[in-house]
């Protein structure tokens, strides 16, 4: 309760102020009159409650929602059970289960890997939110399976766990792959097991006398499959013969290789890929990265032809160089990549070469696997008998083009179009397409476009025409993404606009010269200055 004296004093002050004439302050100085038409009403801008502060608890900080197992594909073998991964615990609260395993489906004969009826595809383990990815169970067949290799122990310095081991597939003799540690060591590859003798390891290279660096060791072949030993690769910089890579029997594509892919087995071997490759690579190539012929001097990249094989192998499947069964793209000046023939008893179809990219619709030379129709631009798929004579080189023509639709700046151009804004032709874009389709960043392939909008990850990247639509899923991907990543508050898109209330003295939208720049705040400041000057 206020003191009576204070109350009387306040009343007296109000009375004195009321007795002053209009436009006159207490010390006698003139004040700038404020017309009633320019006086802003004292309105309070009430902003709605912050969206992030009252977020839906059902999506706050949870893991990826669980997916039902893949129904599989019809066949003649037994269905493989898809393992279910443990629930994700990423976030402040335990969320629903991680991705469910993909089951093989009844008799999902994954023929084509030497297939035949009854070769089921084992289930894929689910993926937890972080950090581990369970192993791949391999391919089941008629021979004993390889035991799963022990997972790596991770790295004590980084504190990250290793990857679990991957088991081999029965019948195929694929060896077990050891887990990959977080850093820095990688486990070895044990070779391929089968019924035939192992190939001797090729001699390691001797290095290069000019560089002073040692060469790489030779690799031995695997038993039964008849892969020859791989010779070591020199440190680079020297003679064309420094690359000690004997190649595969029947494979005539690379210089320094002998034979090709005619692998000893239970059925007649495949012949060499046709047409036969030239003895040397053409010297023409991209500036600064030419592929010299086998007899030429080191090119501008400082490597001889044999040492350039490593670069060629790294590039040939992204469409930047090579030659083979598919003609090169018109106008690119670069050759295509070589074709691969199948091996006996495995039923691998031949791989067509990939052109350098950029030109005609036929530049995409990867015919795929017969019976497998999941990837765009591929024909045929995996309906290959495994015990019958080997498959020849794949011959079905590819689809005319990839769908032109894609993210702005990273579109998948058609095979007949010019290089897109990402600077790559359709053939080179295949690499990007394959890399993206399993992480949900494109609508092509086996992952539906609505993947982003169901799970909110990866974050939606707006295109030139604005953010992509919700696709009718009823799920707010942006809200989920913000909650999932940060778990903090996400301001409402209307809160900022609502907090700035318009006033009567606002400058008109037309921005005319007659608009007044005087504001109540400026008038008050002028009055204060005038009062101070008068007091002096």
UniProtKB/Swiss-Prot annotation:
Transmembrane segments: none annotated. Pathway: Secondary metabolite biosynthesis; terpenoid biosynthesis. The keyword S-adenosyl-L-methionine does not apply. Part of the gene cluster that mediates the biosynthesis of calidodehydroaustin, a fungal meroterpenoid. The first step of the pathway is the synthesis of 3,5-dimethylorsellinic acid by the polyketide synthase ausA. 3,5-dimethylorsellinic acid is then prenylated by the polyprenyl transferase ausN. Further epoxidation by the FAD-dependent monooxygenase ausM and cyclization by the probable terpene cyclase ausL lead to the formation of protoaustinoid A. GO terms for biological process: terpenoid biosynthetic process. In A.calidoustus, the austinoid gene cluster lies on a contiguous DNA region, while clusters from E.nidulans and P.brasilianum are split in their respective genomes. Genetic rearrangements provoked variability among the clusters and E.nidulans produces the least number of austionoid derivatives with the end products austinol and dehydroaustinol, while P.brasilianum can produce until acetoxydehydroaustin, and A.calidoustus produces the highest number of identified derivatives. Residues 141-164, 185-220, 261-302, 385-423, 491-536 are annotated as: Disordered. Residues 195-208, 287-302, 408-423 have a biased composition (Low complexity). Keywords: Signal. It comes from the Eukaryota. This is Austinoid biosynthesis cluster protein W. Residues 1-19 form the signal peptide. Residues 209-220 have a biased composition (Gly residues). The gene is ausW. Coiled coil: none annotated.
